[in-house]
Amino acid sequence: MRPLIIALAAGLAVAALAAAADERPKNIRVCVQFIEIAHPALTEMLAGTDISGPRLHDQALALVKNAAAKVLETCVLTTRPNQKASLASIREVIYPTEYEPPGSVNLPPRQPSIRPELDAFETRNVGSMLEIEPSLQEGSRLIDLGFVPEIVQLVRLDTWMEHTDRWGDASIRRPVFEKSCLNTRVTLMAGQFELVGVITPKPNTPGPATTRKLLVFVRADILPAVSST
């Protein structure tokens, strides 16, 4: 009888510890990965019998290890349930958007022409940004996640007007940006990657973009806010 009582007491103690652990405050860590692969490779992946998120992520990582794909960006952000959070790793690119004609049009002979004066500027954030809003489903390991991952790249500078002044090249150039972004809400099993979007990067030259695909994977983990030790 005594061993039985001891076993029951031990079981109750373990259950109490588990219940106490469940009642501890929790954080949610969100990991977003952008993985660039070839379009035919994506077609082959989606044609398989197992197209679950973890399986597709394993296949994408295998391509990365074989140099057939590359991880373009990884963003990790932790917050409490039902709280919004954001991160940004950016560089501000300031560029002119409006020009005024030169103040004088009656130029003396042989004087170099005057370039239009810069009148207005804009600032564009170039880099990676992430916004998240996770919540826990009570009594389960399911996580409802709203998130907005975004990558902005400066692709090139296009020349709008060629001009040379007394100091050298003073041509007017405008930046061309490329933005990869999605905005969605999904329900995830904690600790498992899920494929939430496929983005088509644009080529530098006009024409259909059919060679590359950008896979967006997301994973959310439940973390205790207070250490158990």
Specify the residue positions occupied by each region the protein language model found.
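Positively charged n-region of N-terminal signal peptides that target proteins for export
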Residues: 1-4
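Extracytoplasmic assembly/pore-lining segments of large envelope/extracellular complexes
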Residues: 21-160, 176-229
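Bacterial N-terminal signal peptides
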Residues: 7-15
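A short, compositionally biased domain-edge/stem linker segment
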Residues: 15-21
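Solvent-exposed, glycine/polar-rich loop segments of beta-barrel outer-membrane systems
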Residues: 160-172
